[in-house]
Design a protein with these regions (language model features):
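Active-site-adjacent alpha-helix immediately C-terminal to a catalytic or transition-state-stabilizing loop
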Residues: 4, 62, 70-72, 145-148, ...
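Active-site glycine-centered loops adjacent to acidic/histidine catalytic or metal-binding residues
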Residues: 9, 83, 181
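Loop-to-helix element that buttresses phosphate recognition and phosphoryl-transfer chemistry
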Residues: 11-67, 71, 79, 145-160, ...
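Flexible, glycine-rich phosphate/dinucleotide-binding loops
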Residues: 13, 87, 118, 185, ...
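Alpha-helix-centered segments that form part of catalytic cores
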Residues: 117, 122-161
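Acidic, His/Gly-rich catalytic cores of divalent-metal-dependent hydrolytic chemistry
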Residues: 228-239
């Protein structure tokens, strides 16, 4: 049975500090490194084959992926795609989440953070966290560089990439591993499980805990489950 393995990167330094990260290229925390190694080990222990891998342009996802591949004695060959980057948080980037909630109020905070189609105010070009024009993003067409994104905006880049690049591997019965981010994976799960615009705000993707989706013929989902059961809540996507 063909498998799609989705893993959010291990905890990042800014995750630990409870800050909005987005496209800033922050590193893994010590805990995040451990989570990545544990993800690789559990995949190995369960003898889950990985045929092809994808990740974003951001080091926290790349390092998580390389840790998993090393644990499984696999060649460090993988595909990077900016379309799998985290959602761009605009002017919220770098801010502490609790402090931001107190400043703008809980209702507005929830809209910016969890709504389907509301984006935060755009990041200014002179922001200290502006990374769009760094060499890291040189291959991205200028017109596609976001200064802010809603989850819908993230969905609109993740899903076409899945359809055009990733899906064909699943059709060929290859097991695919994607190491990405909370919101890019939420967007993909919304698509795969047909989650409604209102229910998607309830979906949380934990760091460093691979989610396996098993497909029958014609890519019909048979079952899905987190590998680390000790840290996984019940997964209910069909909403």
């Amino acid at each position: 049975m063909t498998k799609l393995i989705l893993t959010r990167h291990g905890q990042s330094i800014w995750n630990a500090e409870n800050r909005f990260t987005g496209w800033v290229d922050v590193d893994l925390s010590d805990k995040g490194i451990e989570e990545a190694e544990k993800s690789g080990q559990i995949i190995k222990d369960l003898n889950i084959k990985i045929d092809i891998s994808y990740t974003s342009y951001l080091k926290r996802a790349i390092k998580t992926l390389t840790s998993i591949l090393k644990k499984n004695d696999l060649e460090l060959k993988f595909n990077t795609a900016w379309q799998l980057n985290e959602r761009h948080y605009g002017s919220l980037t770098g801010l502490n989440k609790e402090e931001t909630k107190k400043k703008i109020g809980e209702d507005q905070f929830k809209k910016y953070r969890r709504s389907w189609d509301i984006a935060p105010p755009p990041m200014e070009e002179k922001s200290e966290y502006q990374t769009l024009f760094s060499p890291l993003n040189a291959s991205i067409p200028i017109g596609m560089l976001p200064f802010t994104e809603s989850l819908k905006d993230t969905y609109d880049r993740v899903v076409p990439f899945y359809e055009n690049e990733i899906k064909k591997n699943l059709i060929d019965n290859k097991n695919v591993l994607i190491s990405a981010h909370g919101n890019s994976l939420r967007a993909l799960c919304k698509y795969l499980f047909n989650i409604s615009d209102t229910k998607i705000n309830e979906l949380e993707i934990p760091t460093g805990n691979p989610l396996v989706i098993e497909f029958e013929n014609n890519l019909v989902i048979n079952k899905y489950y987190y590998l680390d059961k000790t840290r996984a809540k019940d997964v209910i996507f069909n909403q």
